[in-house]
């Protein structure tokens, strides 16, 4: 139920070709059910845009911050074999998080700062900005959640170790043995 602006696909394809990358994603506008703006820029609201501009192709960026929003993604079909299957057992790794990480490990990524999607925020979103931003009341809750999520994400990566380059497989093995 998100709204794609008419130029979304065309601009994504153009960026993919012009920047000679394997995968593009972009910012979006967060709106309510009546398309009224809640946040004009998801990237600004979540404090991601500055990080993205600094280190777009680092897997560490996608691992720590989950910068990729699924509905903004466009990638080359040759990468489907790398991202599939998407881990389904993990409660911590959702599809866009997984795709962003794998693409940053295996290919080149470009970011489109323009907003070609109106992301409709409601109770049925898989994650949603309200659940992310307004659910934390105390710093301890945030710290505890961060630790638990990263441990869960790491566990998912270990289970899918064959998707990663050899040097990262070795790092995963060392971390697991630690």
What are these regions (language model features)?
Residues 1-135:
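Nucleotide-sugar donor-binding/catalytic module of glycosyltransferases
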Residues 136-178:
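Terminal low-complexity segments of carbohydrate-biosynthetic enzymes
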